[in-house]
Structure formats: C-alpha cells, structure tokens
Amino acid sequence: MAQVVVTGGAGFLGSRLARELLAAGSLEVAGSGARPLRRVTLIDQAPAPADLAADARVTVIRGDLGELLDAGRAGPDALAGADVIFHLAAAVSGECEADFDLGLRANLRATESLLASCRALGTNPVVVYSSSVAVFGGSPEHPLPAAVDDQTLPNPQTSYGTQKFIGEQLLADYTRKGFLRGRAIRLMTVSVRPGRPNAAASGFLSGIIREPLAGQRAICPVGPETEVALASPAKAIGGLLCAATASDEAWGGRTAVNLPALTMTVAGMAAALERVAGPEVSALIDWVPDPAVARMFATWPGRVRSDRAAGLGLTPDPDFDSVITMHLAESRP
C-alpha cells in the first residue's frame, strides 16, 4: 500500500495532483512496482476542495507547514507512514519580492522543517520538490546562455529563485546523506491556470488567456516579443508524477531536472488565442508595459533544454493552441 503527502495540497497543482493519484488508485514508488493507494494527506493553510475532503482515502491537515512540522507539535507525525511526499507549498515570486520575510518563512524555513521531519521518519521516503525555472537568471556579469540546460549553473535574480535553489541544494544533501530520496524538478511557468489570479509575477501568462476567454480584459505587462518557457498543467503534473515513480537509476543523480518547456513569445500566445477563440477575444488583451515585471522577466530564460527529462520520457506541449483547447475543455461545467 502506498501513502502520499502533498504539501500545498489545496492549491491548484496540489489538488490536481491529488485527483490524478486518487483516480489512478495506485502509485509506483521509485520504480518498485505499482502499489494500491491507501491514503493521500493534503497539508495546506487553505481548506481542501470539497470533492477531495469527501474522499475516504484523503486526510486533510490545515495549518502553516512550518508550524505543523515543528518538533514540539506534530513534528514528523504529520508525515507518518508516507512513502512519497510532494512538496508543492510555497509563496510565489511576486509575494517574495514584496515580502522578503514571507519568502524566507514559506520557501526556506518550511522546507528545512519538512526535510528534517522526513529524516526523523527514518524510512528514506521519496521527496519530490517543486522547484522552478526561476533558479536561472541573467545578470551583466553572468548573462544567460542561448538556452539553459540541466548543467547550467543557477544564478537566480529574485528572492523566490534564490529560495528555490537553496531548497534544491538542501534536498540534494539530505539525499547524499541517505536520509531520503530527493527528486527536484524545475517547473516552467504553468499556463493556463484556471481560477483566480495569484501573486506570481508570471501570473499574467495565464491571465491573458483565461480572462479574455471569460469575456474580461487582461493586461500584458511585457512586450509582445518576450520569450517565455511554458508548460501546461497536464505536463507539470506529469513531471511531478514521473519524479515519484522513476527508479533511482533512471532518475540519475541528485541535481534538479528541468521540466520540458514550450518556448513561445507572448505575441505567439496571443496569436494562438486568436486562432482558437477568434479576434474579438484576443482583442481583449491590453498591452500595458510594467517596467518592474519586464525587468524580472528579462532575467528569466525563455529557452530550456531538458535532456534528463527527455530520457525519462517527458515531452513538452506540442503547441500553445492545444494548451488553450485543453483549458477550454477542462473549464466547461
């Protein structure tokens, strides 16, 4: 029997991951063969979606992750019996730039507490860490290469990217010491996200599609020529699941794996929206430059090579038209 913990389990990716696990009913843990799914524990400050909370296989724990994993409180008990822990809980990029201390608490100290609790379990669980393409960055001293790859040295230019890179290194060291089996996967910007906008600096890359499809205007704060590295929600979930199921030999080392990316210009995204939904919909995008957002995006890579992920069988989305079509299909009542 397999037991899974998802931090950030009430969020968009966390809840989608939980639904896929429950629908499958089994999970192959690190290449050891499929096991029936016994329990999925969702940890989040927000309430879990009603459908997940109603599932008898789901346990919901509400609260701040760092506090819940404090040794003087629940400590490792919150993770007891877990074979796989998906660590998705995080403060997003815009939040971390606006509130430095929030980023430290949510992305660094909570991760430290989680890893310490996994060590205390003494069971060598698989820990899938949701990192980000934001660990890469360009600066005058160290400009970005034409495309980053799995061996490119991270040079984060945001607090969020720095915190994610530190998390990768901590996970690798806990793995080296034999306390757990860490699998860090760098997610690309996920688009199209449904629901309400979040505080991520990259949130507009969903908003310029989602809002016009709902008949609402949306602001694009960067120039149409800006290149971005994207992954659909389905591809992001596929990458997370692959990180949990791959054998140690197939995973191939302690360093992070870049998720495959679909490289698009923002103008190309708008053109795809026009092809799928019509010019009257794409006309709802307002191009209003925001220098602060543009500066941040100028430090992020738009082109990503993902050789290790390709070796694991992961592929990018074929085109953005299909991503929009998928979003429309999933958004229908």
Give the role of each language-model region.
Residues E112-Q157:
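Conserved Rossmann-fold NAD(P)-dependent oxidoreductase catalytic core, especially the SDR/UDP-sugar
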Residues A2-L27:
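N-terminal Rossmann NAD(P)H-binding glycine-rich loop of SDR-like oxidoreductase domains
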Residues L37, P289, P301-G311, T315-P333:
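Amphipathic terminal alpha-helices
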Residues P212, K235, G239, A243-A294:
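Mid/C-terminal beta-alpha module of Rossmann-like enzyme folds, strongest
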Residues R62-A106:
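NAD(P)H-binding glycine-rich loop region in Rossmannoid oxidoreductase-like domains
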Residues E141, N155-R183:
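Active-site Tyr-X1-5-Lys
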Residues A172-E227, P233-K235:
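NAD(P)-dependent short-chain dehydrogenase/reductase
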Residues A98, L102-S113, T158, T162-Q163:
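Glycine-rich NAD(P)-binding loop of the Rossmann-fold in SDR/ketoreductase-type enzymes
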